[in-house]
Amino acid sequence: MKKLKIVTVVGTRPEIIRLACVIKKLDQYCEHILIHTGQNFDYELNEIFFADLGIRKPDYFLGAAGSNSAETIGNVIIEVDKVLKEVNPEAMLVLGDTNSCLGILPAKRRKIPTFHMEAGNRCFDQRVPEEINRRLVDHMADINLTYSSIARDYLLNEGLPPDMVIKTGSPIFEVINTYMDDINSSDILKKMNLTKHQFFVASIHREENVDSDKNFLNIIESLNAVAKVYKFPVIVSTHPRTQKRIDSLKVKLDPLIKILKPLGFLDYNKLQVSAKVTLSDSGSINEESSILKFPALNLREAHERPEGMEEAVVIMTGLCKERIMQSLAIIDNQSDGNQKLLRQVYDYSMPNVSDKVVRIVHSYTDYVNRVVWKKY
């Protein structure tokens, strides 16, 4: 029996993590070609997550990372198109809002049905590079798969046809639950000589936070204040962009701030669930905090997860030291009972997103060929 041939394009750590279960299901039910653009080329940002999650190696590694974003985007489009010409797939799947997702453009030019997971997220802040990518990819994709009802409504309000926008829920719940035993078994606390709830975790990587001197120095000042006031270690999982800024600006860090290379999925989540509070500018912190029930601050001035804020699963602090310290005080005072264990976001509790995606791809590939491309 001939299986449907589909390509999946990834390029960054969040895409690898979120697609962990989907990749395995597509391998099972499809002729599946996995493409890694090489947008993140550091070992710690790539292979460590393939190993942690038991994901096979990509069929193609494109090495598309350039000296700037324009060069990277150009390389992604050119190199993905070469693979599409070679393998001639029946469908393409992308997830998220990174430059790697722009590999959808050559697929559209080749009239290949395209599916976009994590569609419809909006932060309405054009300073965020991913916001531009989201809007482009959402409006190029044939079928948009949203995490939440709010994201679906955004796309409908932008004029996309209702039959082409499907809410699947977030895939991260399935991923976390699949690997929960491994997360619990991590010995990272022992290795680092940490005591549960007596340390902080921090992750800072967003372009708008790191590449701005003012924003980055505000964050460093805040982390120093956290270490000084609480006298607990602050464990920073450091993106290469962040490390370069630390080095170039010669910032002074409190001795309690520990700068580490990027941690794997299992160890990092073990730290998050064990920390006093996680401070992060990650787009996924709302989901992780809601699912794993740990307190978190979102160090951003805009976000694309309003469904998370409806349940107040995190506090969005901006980059002001005073607001960050006030928010930590709120978490301290709400540390017991129902005030801490806020209700889990419904759209973040879907147990079978990988199965949904397989069914949707098989349901809509021929539909897109017929309705969009008039092939039949």
Name each region found by the language model.
Residues 1-232, 237, 242-376:
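Nucleotide-activated sugar donor-binding and catalytic core shared by glycosyltransferases
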